[in-house]
Amino acid sequence: MPTINVNKIDLEKLINMSLSDKTIDHKFPMMGVEVEEIFEENNQKIVQFSINPDRPDYLSVEGLARGFRGFIGIDAGLPKYDIYASDLEVYVENVKSRPYCGFAIIKNIIIDDLVLESIINLQEKLHWSIGRDRKKMAIGIHDLDKIEAPFYYKEINGDEIEFEPLGHNELMTPKEVLEKHEKGVKYAHLLRGDKFPIIVDKNNAVISMPPIINGNLTKVGTETRNLLVEITGTDKNAVENTLNIIVCALADRRGTIFSLKLINNGNETISPDLTPDSAEITIDEINTRLGLNLNAGEIIACLKKARYDAQYSYEDENIKITIPAYRTDILNNMDIIKDVAINYGYENFNGNLPVVATIGEKHDIEKKFEFIRNTMIGYGLFEVMNLTLSNQDVLFNKMNENIEDNEYVEVLKPASIEHRVVRPTILPLLLETLANNKHNELPQKIFEVGDCVVIDEKDETLYTHCKNVPKVSAVITHHNANFNEIKGLVEGLIREMNIEYSIDNYKHPSFIEGRCAKIIVDDEIVGYFGELHPEVILNFELGYPVVGFEMEIK
């Protein structure tokens, strides 16, 4: 879990009360935020918090203070953030590498050393958590008074413009930034092709080269009073969610929020948008999940402590909830129920010890997983662990498969478009891992063992009509990767598992015809292997031959 270091005086100032170390140690964990340690640094008391990944709004001292004020009853209900319209415009062109953007203006903010440190730390934590190290989104915060509107977000050639990158006094082109600047070298893999995203002002002064570096011109300091916030990325939800979190944090510092008009091919949108979300939940649903007997008033009180607005509808006999825009973690009613539990107080729940003592042991499938892991590692492969959620593009389109020819389980309310399908296969995710590591040396040999989810109309478990299928998959890439190499790996693994099998020719759209085989056990096809089709290799932007296999674990 990510950790943040918070200056205790700054935290107390935002909460508007003094806090003893004992209070911090006791109260914050009950709010769902672990206190790692309290220590002194440069004669200042520092509190280190461990933040759950599902609460990115807690990655700043402003967010923690906002949540704590509600938790202890200083504030209640939805925080109010006024947005004033500015006359500033941003012209957005078609930026293929990072097509989504969001902008906001914060005026009249007082920035001292603590505020500046908080802004920088929040940026970096959000880059890692929501941004996946700037892949999904990147943040830029600038001194507004040093630039002139309108602003332009567009693509340019690598040598089309020169600017001073942040922290440097040397003029560089975008191409030179990727070759010479430490941030450019580190994040060059995020920009492919000969066009580079850039944000400039009316006078063509460079504000930012996302997701790499800001311009030196707009560097923020303690003298800054007005800010331009820009978020760009590959994931629309990530961009919008990040902008909301940052804008609310800066508003909690008494900054005033102003919107801008984004103009894209004649279409106009206003940014930021802090419109609250809404949800409905019944009293029975909450009480059944928590094992409590709360009435509507008690539930609403808990919800308001969690900084929701809530009211009971006698007509519908449910509770209507308004969710603040910075709560990007709310996916369904279970998240709301968890907040009710936290603000009811975990210490108020009664626990009963089980009547019968039990001793756990590894499930048979876990024993097989462990055996396969050890065998694959013995063959010189590295284990990776991908997310169970992916998307149709990675799982099917890039694998030369028609989506219509495949059945899969789709998430009802995905957190992002990149994670809306439960994987029915592992192989595409391994290819995506290779794509993310193509800047590393060859050969690369990786495998994964884990569950996939497939449609099964006969399965009545929880009425889902789907089931888990354990699988093992591996890929190998280097200059001379070939069919015989992957065939030897597959046969070696199956022999180690002491399974009778046979191999026959197989036609699969992801593999080269004539260089693909199926694995047959008990007259049933349990897997396949071979040389990946050149189109698949190009779809994942890989530069060398790739071989791979995937097999069910019976």
Curated annotation (Swiss-Prot):
Matching CDD domains: PheRS_beta_core
InterPro entries: aa-tRNA-synth_II/BPL/LPL, B3/B4_tRNA-bd, DNA-bd_dom_put_sf, Phe-tRNA-ligase_IIc_bsu, Phe-tRNA-synth_IIc_bsu_arc_euk, Phe-tRNA_synthase-like_B3/B4, Phe_tRNA_ligase_beta2_arc, PheRS_beta_core
Cellular localisation: Cytoplasm
MF terms in GO: ATP binding; magnesium ion binding; phenylalanine-tRNA ligase activity; RNA binding
Cofactor list: Mg(2+)
Main localization of the protein described in the UniProt heading: cytoplasm
Pfam (any one): B5
Keyword field contains Ligase: yes
Record PANTHER family: PHENYLALANINE--TRNA LIGASE BETA SUBUNIT (PTHR10947:SF0), PHENYLALANYL-TRNA SYNTHETASE BETA CHAIN AND LEUCINE-RICH REPEAT-CONTAINING PROTEIN 47 (PTHR10947)
Classification via HAMAP family: Phe_tRNA_synth_beta2
NCBIfam families (alphabetical): pheT_arch
Name listed for the protein in its UniProt record: Phenylalanine--tRNA ligase beta subunit
